[in-house]
Amino acid sequence: MAQQKFLHQRPIQNPFTNPFSSSPLSTSSISNRPISLLSRNGLLLLLALLVILGVFLPWAGSPLFPSPNKLSPSQSKWRDYSLPQAVKFVAKNGTVIVCAVSYPYLPFLNNWLISVSRQKHQDQVLVIAEDYATLYKVNEKWPGHAVLIPPALDSQTAHKFGSQGFFNFTARRPQHLLEILELGYNVMYNDVDMVWLQDPFQYLEGKHDAYFMDDMTAIKPLDHSHDLPPPGKKGRTYICSCMIFLRPTNGAKLLMKKWIEELETQPWSRAKKANDQPGFNWALNKTANQVDMYLLSQAAFPTGGLYFKNKTWVKETKGKHAIIHNNYIVGFEKKIKRFRDFNLWLVDDHASESPLGKLE
């Protein structure tokens, strides 16, 4: 687990375009002579038809490619649902909790939602859907709690860590957060491969601009400093972009703008295979003197490389954990297995506790 402005300037691909429709052909482009299926041209046409059917038919009933003729009135409504409308609907006490989700991540969304519901904060959740299938599924089950900010992404590539699709997916995050700050709301962002064990809001001490958690596995003392840690070997810190809380201050907005700038100057390439986290850390380091920052307690917000790999530390800090992040591991099945091993995969037995219920 940055919305650069150029991402919004790309031509928007309409996922509802019918792949089988075409404009009428002019009579000048069609021969009046009948084509025999046994002729060379006939065989080529037949082969082309079979290829087209083989490619598109398996997707015909897929939720990722809904037909424009099959859109219900409610689905059409959600296509026009805006971020200001959505934030106003879900916000409580001036605060909204957001996550960004593509269709393959729905099981993780549901698992995370169960844990959020147990802390009585589910009504504040806004799912930023990265594809129309997610938008429709969430709003079908939980009306008003999902919004799509165009352009929609390819959900089949957005979840592959290190891919350009994954970069495009994560790179939109600071722009989403900045837009919410500009609307005047506090915002908490979570990756959905997380589980809440306690209410994290009790740890947001003071009135700082930005709160975040360290992604390092080195054990800190329980009374460690809450200042931004010193840079590591790469010249920057190693803060996780998976869990962030921001107040609608000039400092928080400056941090998001700098994050966007960093992602624009360090785009994805086959050589680097970047994600959004290095850009976030450079932004933190470059604005440290202008933004009031707060490093959250390691005991309450441990990285997965510590929580899942150091049993002694987990026992010593028992009862202090607020949010567990299932990182330092790649792959859906591996993440699910690890959650199950630690009794944190809640959807198997507790799906009814999620606002989405059991997802088929």
From Swiss-Prot:
Its cofactor is Mn(2+); Mg(2+). Residues 1-25 are annotated as: Disordered. Residues 14-25 have a biased composition (Low complexity). Residues 63-360 are lumenal. Glycans are attached at residues 93, 168, 285, 310. Pfam families: Nucleotid_trans (PF03407). It is an enzyme of class 2 (transferase). One of its GO terms (cellular component) is Golgi apparatus. One of its GO terms (biological process) is pollen tube development. Residues 1-41 are cytoplasmic. It is found in: Golgi apparatus membrane. The keyword Transferase applies. Keywords: Cell wall biogenesis/degradation, Glycoprotein, Glycosyltransferase, Golgi apparatus, Membrane, Signal-anchor, Transferase, Transmembrane, Transmembrane helix. The chain crosses the membrane at residues 42-62. SUPFAM superfamilies: Nucleotide-diphospho-sugar transferases. Catalyzes the transfer of D-xylose from UDP-alpha-D-xylose onto L-fucose. Probably involved in the biosynthesis of rhamnogalacturonan II (RG-II) through xylosylation of the internal fucose moiety of the A-chain of RG-II, a structurally complex pectic polysaccharide of the primary cell wall. RG-II is essential for the cell wall integrity of rapidly growing tissues such as roots and pollen tube growth and elongation. The conserved DXD motif is involved in enzyme activity. Belongs to the glycosyltransferase 77 family. This is UDP-D-xylose:L-fucose alpha-1,3-D-xylosyltransferase MGP4. It comes from Arabidopsis thaliana.
